[in-house]
């Protein structure tokens, strides 16, 4: 299983700092100067329910449904991370429908469709920007293999 980002709803305050950190981390110049409502394209989304808030992001599925349904194979696995090859994406939204976690979205930027999903900030040596920016530490990068081993040790 692949590592992915998980949110603790008990700690999430719905501040959307994770979304801003994601947008900035995926901009070419890594600053807020070019962010506008039209270009605010986060790969993590804060969802607000009646009694809780939590962040939703890609679970990096082993057999990713989003990749399976893409008619142009725009979603490919690189070094254990599912990524979107934007040049290939046709904006059909099949990936959005197929994702069981609601973690995919297709947006339009300058008349071009872009499919967005979390890539765990693979371009950052320090790891996911959202995890680093969360003021309440509600986000963490979960490695299912490590978690399973810890649970087995705890039971022993």
Stretches with model-predicted labels:
Residues 1-156:
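Non-ligating segments of multi-cofactor redox enzymes
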């Amino acid at each position: 299983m692949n590592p992915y980002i998980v949110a603790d709803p008990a700690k999430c305050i719905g501040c959307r700092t994770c979304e801003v950190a994601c947008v900035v981390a995926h901009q070419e110049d890594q600053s807020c100067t070019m962010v506008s409502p039209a270009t605010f394209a986060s790969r993590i989304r804060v969802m607000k329910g009646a009694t809780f808030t939590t962040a939703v992001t890609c679970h990096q599925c082993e057999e990713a449904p989003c990749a399976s349904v893409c008619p142009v194979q725009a979603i490919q696995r690189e070094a254990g991370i599912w990524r979107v090859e934007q040049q290939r994406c046709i904006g059909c939204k099949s990936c959005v429908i197929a994702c069981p976690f609601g973690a995919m979205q297709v947006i339009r930027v300058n008349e071009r469709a872009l499919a967005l999903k979390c890539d765990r900030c693979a371009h950052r040596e320090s790891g996911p920007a959202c995890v680093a920016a969360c003021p309440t530490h509600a986000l963490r990068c979960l490695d299912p293999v490590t978690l399973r081993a810890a649970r087995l040790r705890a039971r022993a």
